[in-house]
Curated annotation (Swiss-Prot):
Any one GO cellular component localisation term in the record: extracellular space
InterPro entries reported in the protein's UniProt record: FAM3 (IPR039220), ILEI/PANDER_dom (IPR039477), ILEI_FAM3C (IPR039475)
Signal peptide (residue range): 1-24
Membership in a protein family: Belongs to the FAM3 family.
Disulfide bonds: C59-C87, C65-C222
Any one GO MF annotation of this record: carbohydrate binding
Principal localisation: secreted
Expressed in which tissues: Expressed in the retinal ganglion cell layer.
Protein name: Protein FAM3C
CDD domains: ILEI_FAM3C
Subcellular location: Secreted
Keyword Signal in annotation: yes
Amino acid sequence: MRIAGAIKFVVAVALFLLTFYVISQVFEIKSYTNLGNIFVRSAIDTVAHPTTKAPRYRCGISKVCPEKHFAFKIASGAANVVGPKICVDDNILMSGVKNNVGRGINTALVNGKTGALIETTYHDLWGGEVGPFIEFLKKIPDGTIVLMATYDDGATKLNDDARKRISELGSTLINVLAFRDNWVFVGGKGIKTKSPFEQHIKNNKDTNKYEGWPEVVEMEGCIPQKLNE
């Protein structure tokens, strides 16, 4: 009897181990199958939805410009610390890195037909005089694209004559530009209408981002190429 009982016990253990083995093998197969399905789905998703970088447009603006237009991006200075930046057709014309900006109104002149840079300059309208700035404005050739950005203060020495000449370039906000306001503008010599490219942030102690200065004002867009004589 003892031998028969031992045999039954051994058979029971063997059946248990066999059952466990079969179940584990089936589970393992299913696991591999599931993992395979996951990898297959992942590969299909990668092919169907490939990762692509967002396109970069000229001057880093948010859209592509139409044909016969120049992309531009312009930013005023930040307080009296960081200078303005002017980019046209993917070329940085003025910036602190280029070391060609300064306190006052910073100006870049661009050929309206080719987009080529004509001149960059700045006029100190806080510690300097307005006379040289007026003479500069008088000599801008017709058909020239004019880009302007303030840094620190661009208004203290502005007089009616200077404001009138900037207004003739297409500005509508130059007459309200005041001490330490931030302002950016794109216009043209000989323009027949007011420019759509102008932004202004007033110096206001209650809303200023920096102590004594408003936040930086930025603007981007597409300037139509001058086609007619």
